[in-house]
């Protein structure tokens, strides 16, 4: 937070802060908390019903309860109250004060989750209890459980961060609305993000992708290579639109319901440690502090770039000293050692790009693009951002035999992307006319419908109204008019040779994109 506020003070020095129209943050807070195992402890209580053993879900320790709801929302097995009380007593004895309760198909009927919460809150007064259907109404029980657990594990720390940001801006008399960048490249008001902090994971790579969209010609198909100190993030822009991961963000080996770009992180960057063992040179994955040319203790790719004249960062003599140490163990010159370091970095990143292309080809959005375009995906460019991009990306592009683009302001593409990203939200509506009910997937809002033979047009109208209401709750109602229906389908339910109802599904979204009016100065 101190670094962020220091940068903010530099930015607003000599500026009339009353003219600031919006503040957008791209933060790695949640990412770092999860990576460093600094999240709050959570007791995970599952009501899985019949099917796959929940111990196979890779969700960590959990408590399993009896009871089941089917896919239509009908209770098919009852809860065991004594079992619930026993589970609550175990949680109390453990000292954990946060409980995530997640039942299979709870988004169709939350009665079991609510009953468990009611009983446990009496035995665990003061504990924070999060229910799965309120975090996500999407199908896929393991992902909803993972998302609920991570939401509760990060919510309090994120709230402290948001409060500190709000106070810091208030102290600086900055009254502009504050937004946070999400993993899908859209922004969300800071206050609205308090209920869904895990949405901000991977906002760093998302900001870089939005920055590339802003800094390169529209409609291009490009591989984005964001080279940082410790890692390099790879992403794909298809005809001007970033590719989203169909399975949601993967967090700490768990798939979640967080919408996110399809990004791969490679454990290599400008600060990666260079080592030699048995005449074999390795770069990364570990990082041992700053580059030697910047006062660090060991050689890095940044030192190699400095020796070869591809960068002006750091002290040249210290960089030469670092590469000389590598050269002595490889029996070559310092310049040759530097070339070998860069060749290793370029080869690792290029091979990861090729491997990720094979992964991208499995994404539904890519396959649809391939059908629509009637052509095989071939990147037109490799677009580099980050401090080391001007030096490394031309080499990576050459290895991949494509054009290289390092846009102006590439070093701050992340900040530009955050600044120009517009708000975005998604709403998935499921309607069961026989049961007379609807539910929204994003926040589990439920309601009644009276029309047994509801048409798709009526369903889309209801979805639009609910999206406008959700946008209002999140403080971005002015963008709701831009919402598009991206899919809608209906299934008739037949019983006894007669249609007894319909299942309708509608998806609407304010798509990710750039603000309509912006410029770099």
Regions found by a protein language model. Name each.
Residues 1-521:
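N-terminally biased helix-coil "hinge/interface" segments that flank
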